[in-house]
Amino acid sequence: MFRIVNGEDYSPEVQQRNSLDFGKAPSLLWTDNGGSNDRCETGGNGRESGQDRVKRPMNAFIVWSRDQRRKVALENPQMQNSEISKRLGYDWKMLTEAEKQPFFEEAQRLRAMHRDKYPGYKYRPRRKAKRPQKLLPADSSVLCSRMHIEETLYPFTYKDGCAKATRSRMESRLSHSQPTNTTSSLLPQEHRSSWTSLSHNRVT
């Protein structure tokens, strides 16, 4: 059976007795979704092992969804577990209070049994590790200002995390190319200016 243990329960005699009693646990106290946070109370050392784990009593929805989940899974073998959960949540909301009442009563009975069996039980949910958030969403597109390169306008966009790297490369290229381009673009203008001045002197 599941027990809340302390530091004195780790003797060989107690460990052997717990292993013999492990297969006699009632099938009432289990959660419908094994991957949820409705986990357990840990032992005295803060570690969770197979025998130290005490699950929360089922609520009314879990009591109702036990048989419903099996039924939906058998009728729709290709349906994913997440889709089944969404469907069950919708179906539960559509039930009337009278239809839900038997399951609330059963959940209350299970809660009382759990309280009598584990008087010192306290629910401690597991903390989920935070995932690093991206600076830009995957589908974002930032339209940048147009840049004047060799007298031609070229619009471009930055996407995702490559924006800074692309912009730095473009700025590096422009810093090297702009002086040469500026000089080459000014040469024809100076030539035309000198030619115009010579023609003007000849006419006068």
UniProtKB/Swiss-Prot annotation:
Signal peptide location: none
Record's comment on post-translational modification: Acetylation of Lys-130 contributes to its nuclear localization and enhances its interaction with KPNB1. Deacetylated by HDAC3.
Compartments where located: Nucleus speckle; Cytoplasm; Nucleus
Gene Ontology terms: biological process: cell differentiation; male sex determination; sex differentiation
Key words of the record: Acetylation, Activator, Calmodulin-binding, Cytoplasm, Differentiation, DNA-binding, Nucleus, Repressor, Sexual differentiation, Transcription, Transcription regulation
PROSITE patterns: HMG_BOX_2
Primary location group: nucleus
Intrachain S-S bonds: none
Superkingdom of this protein's organism: Eukaryota
Entry's Gene Ontology cellular component terms: cytoplasm; nuclear speck; nucleus
Pfam families registered for this protein in UniProt: HMG_box
Family annotation (InterPro entries): HMG_box_dom, HMG_box_dom_sf, SRY, SRY-related_HMG-box_TF-like
GO molecular function: calmodulin binding; DNA-binding transcription activator activity, RNA polymerase II-specific; RNA polymerase II cis-regulatory region sequence-specific DNA binding
Region ranges (Disordered): 25-52, 169-204
Subunit organization: Interacts with CALM, EP300, HDAC3, KPNB1, ZNF208 isoform KRAB-O, PARP1, SLC9A3R2 and WT1. The interaction with EP300 modulates its DNA-binding activity. The interaction with KPNB1 is sensitive to dissociation by Ran in the GTP-bound form. Interaction with PARP1 impaired its DNA-binding activity.
PANTHER family reported in the protein's UniProt record: SEX-DETERMINING REGION Y PROTEIN, SOX TRANSCRIPTION FACTOR
Job of this protein: Transcriptional regulator that controls a genetic switch in male development. It is necessary and sufficient for initiating male sex determination by directing the development of supporting cell precursors (pre-Sertoli cells) as Sertoli rather than granulosa cells. Involved in different aspects of gene regulation including promoter activation or repression. Binds to the DNA consensus sequence 5'-[AT]AACAA[AT]-3'. SRY HMG box recognizes DNA by partial intercalation in the minor groove and promotes DNA bending. Also involved in pre-mRNA splicing.
The family this protein is said to belong to: Belongs to the SRY family.
Protein known as: Sex-determining region Y protein
Organism: Balaenoptera musculus (Blue whale)
